[in-house]
């Protein structure tokens, strides 16, 4: 590590561009599923798997990639991630073979796993105090803002230029990111780690999470009383206990459970998982207004514009609140406003224009709350991690983001489909949205009990 080097705006821009290769471009496929079906001649199931694989593989590999970044260098790992992003995007656009689409999406997931913890660790190393909080705000703008606009962006590009241009733009952005990061001094963990990579832990984790994903997304199709369903449940449970046993025995665990002895880190990570899980709100609300109210995909996207605007505006506000009052109060405030927003979006029984108003205000609260929450949460997580474990700690934190989003969408979609089939489309949407309200309440409770009231950083600033 270069002791005298301090990061500037050029490095921040390079990192943010790297971050949006996942949050904006890779996630944009959620709104171009019909286009993909037509281009690849594939059924809905195949395309759904391809769309979800990136977030899932990102979540599964992000911790291991964070640990590897600590060992081989975070700048090097970021560049590897950007190169993988280019390869994944190229595989998706060069042919009409579904197998290459799926492979490209898997590679994009591994790319995101390399980029996210490495860039967070670079920011912790080369920025300090208020400058670090500012840098993290822009990182959050890349991730939360990218996820906020990805649906509208994907639909707009696919409609005007063709869906492949999403990934052509992604390749260009990845190259720009590499050029901007070039010249940044390498940073590694100060403690030399001679232990072998936890391959066994990674294999068990992959088996467990893939099985759990199938249980959630395909449970109804398999039949909740079928042998396949119970077999998968058994695999998830057995794999979970094997994973715990393996992680306690190995010298270099994939997930270092000692990090969770730090309550603020635990609270930030759990609440981050749950508040990424409420992304299920978007898929339920968008599907409902199209199926239940006859909106087009573009009209549905317009309803959520207030979400995008507020999340981008409020991230810097969250940073300022963090500096003035510590992390707990803005995290609680943000989460509370998110819950109010989802509750307003869930008022599907309101007539016509009244529901539109409720939805627009709800999305506004949704974005406002997430924007306030983002920077205090991220700063709490990495500030409470030991310097030699910051890559692994960042990896676990971002694993919570990816898996929260992946499973939140999967759970909301499954609840919506099941509830609509057994009741009505309005009741089904309301039930699925209240599942997201419940996740928000659980996040609030995690913050309330795990994040301390006294923040030493605020006292130090005074």
What are these regions (language model features)?
Residues 67-200:
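Helix-loop-helix hairpins in multi-pass membrane proteins, especially solute transporters
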Residues 23, 27, 93, 109-117, ...:
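Small-residue-rich segments within alpha-helical transmembrane domains of MFS-like 12-TM solute carriers
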Residues 159-271, 303:
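Hydrophobic transmembrane-helix bundles of small-molecule transporters
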Residues 44-45, 129-139, 297, 387-396:
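Loop-to-transmembrane helix entry/capping segments in MFS-fold secondary transporters
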Residues 10-21, 29-31, 161, 227-229, ...:
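12-transmembrane solute porter fold
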Residues 52-66, 116-120, 305-317:
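Central cavity-lining transmembrane alpha-helices of secondary-active solute carriers
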Residues 32-60, 298-302:
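Extracellular/periplasmic helix-loop-helix junction of adjacent transmembrane segments
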Residues 15, 22-23, 51-54, 58, ...:
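Structural signature of transmembrane alpha-helices in multi-pass secondary transporters
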């Amino acid at each position: 590590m270069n002791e005298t080097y301090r990061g500037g705006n050029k490095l921040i821009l390079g990192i943010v561009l790297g971050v949006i290769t996942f949050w904006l471009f890779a996630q944009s496929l959620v709104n171009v599923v019909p286009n993909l079906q037509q281009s690849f001649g594939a059924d809905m199931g195949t395309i759904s798997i391809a769309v979800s694989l990136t977030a899932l593989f990102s979540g599964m590999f992000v911790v291991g990639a964070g640990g590897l970044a600590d060992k081989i260098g975070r700048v090097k790992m970021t560049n590897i991630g950007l190169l993988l992003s280019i390869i994944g995007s190229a595989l998706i656009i060069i042919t009409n073979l579904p197998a290459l689409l799926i492979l490209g999406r898997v590679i994009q997931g591994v790319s995101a796993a390399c980029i996210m913890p490495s860039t967070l660790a670079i920011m912790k190393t080369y920025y300090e105090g208020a400058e670090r909080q500012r840098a993290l705000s822009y990182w959050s703008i890349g991730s939360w803002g990218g996820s906020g606009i990805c649906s509208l962006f994907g639909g707009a590009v696919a409609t005007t230029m063709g869906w492949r241009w999403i990934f052509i733009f992604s390749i260009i952005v990845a190259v720009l990111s590499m050029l901007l990061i070039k010249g940044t001094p390498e940073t590694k963990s100060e403690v030399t780690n001679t232990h072998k990579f936890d391959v066994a832990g990674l294999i068990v984790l992959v088996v467990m999470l893939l099985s759990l994903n199938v249980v959630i997304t395909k449970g109804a199709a398999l039949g909740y009383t079928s042998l396949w369903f119970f077999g998968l449940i058994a695999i998830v449970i057995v794999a979970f206990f094997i994973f715990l046993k393996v992680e306690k025995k190995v010298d270099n665990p994939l997930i270092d459970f000692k990090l969770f002895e730090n309550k603020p880190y635990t609270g930030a990570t759990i609440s981050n998982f749950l508040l990424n899980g409420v992304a299920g709100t978007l898929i339920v609300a968008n599907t409902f207004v199209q199926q239940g109210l006859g909106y087009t995909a573009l009209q549905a996207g317009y309803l959520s514009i207030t979400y995008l605007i507020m999340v981008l505006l409020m991230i810097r506000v969250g940073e300022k609140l963090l500096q003035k009052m510590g992390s707990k109060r803005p995290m609680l405030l943000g989460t509370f406003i998110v819950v109010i927003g989802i509750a307003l979006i869930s008022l599907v029984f309101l007539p016509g224009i009244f529901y539109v108003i409720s939805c627009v205000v709800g999305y506004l609260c949704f974005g406002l709350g997430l924007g306030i929450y983002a920077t205090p949460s991220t700063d709490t997580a990495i500030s409470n991690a030991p310097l030699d474990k910051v890559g692994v700690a960042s990896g676990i934190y971002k694993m919570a983001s990816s898996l929260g989003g992946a499973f939140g969408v999967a759970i909301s979609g499954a609840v919506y489909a099941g509830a609509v089939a057994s009741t009505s489309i309005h009741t089904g949407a309301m039930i699925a949205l209240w599942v997201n309200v419940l996740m928000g309440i659980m996040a609030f409770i995690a913050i309330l009990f795990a994040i301390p009231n006294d923040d030493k950083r605020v006292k130090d600033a005074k």
